[in-house]
Design a protein with these regions (language model features):
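Bacterial N-terminal signal peptides that target proteins for export
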Residues: 1-9
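Tryptophan-anchored aromatic micro-motifs
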Residues: 31-53, 88
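Boundary at the C-terminal end of the N-terminal hydrophobic targeting segment
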Residues: 21-23
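N-terminal glycine/threonine-rich, aromatic-flanked beta-hairpin/loop signature
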Residues: 52-98, 106, 131-132
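Bacterial N-terminal signal peptides
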Residues: 9-19
């Protein structure tokens, strides 16, 4: 009989202590900001040394997906209505809140014929949970894949919520 009493007492003690632990209010976890999500960008062609904009900035939308892919859309001067959105990949880089991405978009002439591509390589730094800046290199290729020219870019962005 004593053994049964001890077992019941131990079982009741475990149930009571487990209930207390499960019901205790826990503070919410502090989530480290990440680049994942939708961003409203302002992009410009920039001086490669100073990062200063050389032309009027243009708006863009970028989405960084949790699987390391990204999609973006902008329509800078000189592009046509048949150009594709940007598609690419992103990754975390060493250091606090540093990322990089590489993407591509295709260009088509007014007749719908493929005329080349543009590739963006960017280094991104989250300046807060809801903003980032980037330094970009843009390469433009003809339809045969020959490099036509490169230039630098700069962007600032805010998270779309």
């Amino acid at each position: 009989m004593k053994l049964k009493t001890k077992i019941v007492a131990i079982a009741l003690g475990l149930v009571a202590s487990t209930s207390l632990v499960w019901s205790a209010d826990r503070p919410p976890r502090e989530a480290t900001p990440t680049i994942q999500g939708v961003w409203q960008d302002t992009r410009c062609r920039a001086n490669c040394e100073s990062g200063e904009c050389l032309e009027s900035p243009i708006p863009a939308l970028s989405t960084f997906h949790s699987d390391g892919t990204l999609t973006a859309y902008t329509n800078p001067p000189g592009t046509g209505p048949l150009d594709t959105p940007e598609a690419g990949v992103w990754q975390r880089e060493p250091g606090a809140q540093n990322y990089s991405y590489h993407d591509i978009s295709y260009f088509y002439d007014e007749n719908g014929a493929f005329s080349g591509s543009g590739q963006v390589t960017a280094n991104v730094h989250l300046t807060s949970a809801n903003s980032f800046t980037s330094s970009d290199t843009i390469a433009v290729y003809d339809a045969d894949g020959n490099l036509l020219f490169t230039f630098c870019g700069h962007a600032t962005a805010t998270r779309f919520e």
